[in-house]
Regions:
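A transmembrane helix-and-boundary motif of multi-pass membrane transporters/channels
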Residues: 1-210, 217-218, 222, 341-351
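Long, hydrophobic alpha-helical segments that serve as membrane-spanning/inserting helices
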Residues: 1-23, 169-234, 247-352
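Secondary-structure capping and boundary motifs in well-ordered enzyme cores
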Residues: 74, 78, 233-237, 267
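A membrane-cytosol interface segment of integral membrane proteins
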Residues: 240-247
Length: 352
């Protein structure tokens, strides 16, 4: 897939309701599987449906489909083989069969807590389905094994039809996060406010959404073959921006005299507008593709520092505490630097 592909309004709408889309896909897959079972009169017809739901339910993005498909099919086949061996051992010795099943379930539990949890889960599920057959009825066990494999293949087929891309979902979520960040930024530093706004819940939501995006990094990297380090860098900067915004708000509203000085710094306000424009350009790039690097205008920041020094001299009689003022300016400079780095990383992520 092209990483710089422009997102259509329809795609954005679909991906914003991806849980509804995935639920609809699972429902249609269940109905079609049920009709296939009835049409061909497949024995032990419960197990393809059970397997399809177990396998298809957790899969959502295309980056997870292919690797997990092999995990699931491998787990299903191995579980079937272990189950058939267990049924043969039961004819020889029940204690030996129990030891064999215990060893197989130990393998299931061990894999379930490793890098291939779904494979371990399906080994255990398939083993339980197969050994649940009546004693000595190998035909029933074979049908159950085949039904589980059939359910696995159908689940992979339905998941691969119009799959959702984790990379596109990541782009939309990052654009949404930056948009919300811009709104909170404007609300916190609006010159029309007389008192500090209560934005704690909004900041917490920004941080929570940033943490949730980490789950998209692995499948997005597999889909685009873009190194995970780029996604991790964007993730870190996104989280840092939220943390620095909270510190900026604290410094901006620290004391009334210092807030009055910052409020009257015209060049500092110009810097705030510059950062808002950078955020808007990043959001536009994430939706439209083909981004251009953003270079911060550090001269505006230097001019703002000089202006603040003059304002402090003019308001020397107010005994203004300088620490919040210079802390706020430094945080502004660091925020602009972080946005510049974020722009460069987004350009690398949205390359052709």
């Amino acid at each position: 897939m092209r990483a710089d592909k422009s997102l259509s309004p329809f795609e954005i709408r679909v991906y914003r309701h991806y849980r509804i889309v995935h639920g609809t896909r699972v429902a249609l897959a269940f109905l079609l599987t049920f009709l296939i079972i009835r049409l061909f009169t497949i024995p032990e017809s419960t197990w393809p449906l059970v397997t399809m739901v177990v396998i298809m339910g957790p899969i959502s993005f295309w980056g997870n489909v292919v690797p997990r498909a092999f995990e699931r099919i491998g787990g299903t086949v191995l579980g079937s083989i272990l189950g058939l061996i267990a049924l043969q051992l039961e004819l020889i010795s029940l204690p030996l069969m129990l030891v064999w099943c215990a060893a197989a379930m130990f393998l299931c539990g061990w894999l379930a807590l490793g890098k291939k949890p779904y494979q371990g889960l399906l080994i255990g599920v398939t083993l339980a389905i197969v050994v649940g057959s009546p004693t000595g009825e190998i035909d029933t066990a074979l049908w159950r094994s085949g039904d589980v494999i059939l359910g696995s293949l159908l689940a992979m087929l339905f998941t691969g039809i119009w799959p959702q891309r984790a990379f596109i979902h990541w782009r939309i979520q990052l654009a949404k996060s930056l948009t919300e960040y811009n709104r909170v930024y404007q609300s916190a530093f609006s010159p029309n406010l007389l008192e500090r706004p209560r934005l704690e819940s909004h900041l917490q939501k920004l941080l929570t959404d940033a943490v949730k995006m980490r789950g998209l990094i692995a499948p997005a990297s597999k889909e685009t073959r873009i190194p995970k380090s780029i996604y991790e860098g964007i993730q870190t900067i996104n989280r840092n921006l939220v943390c620095m915004l909270e510190l900026q708000i604290n410094a901006y509203w620290a004391t009334r005299p210092s807030h009055f000085v910052l409020l009257n710094a015209q060049k500092l306000r110009d810097t705030q507008h510059m950062m808002q424009q950078i955020l808007l350009s990043l959001v536009h790039a994430l939706y439209e593709g083909n981004p251009q690097p953003v270079f911060a205008n550090t001269e505006k920041l230097n001019d703002a520092v000089e202006e603040l020094r003059q304002l402090l001299d003019n308001h020397h009689d107010l005994k203004v505490v300088e620490t919040p003022i210079y802390g706020y300016v430094w945080l502004n400079m660091e925020t602009v630097h972080q946005l510049e780095l974020l722009s460069n990383l987004i350009c690398r992520a949205l390359r052709k």
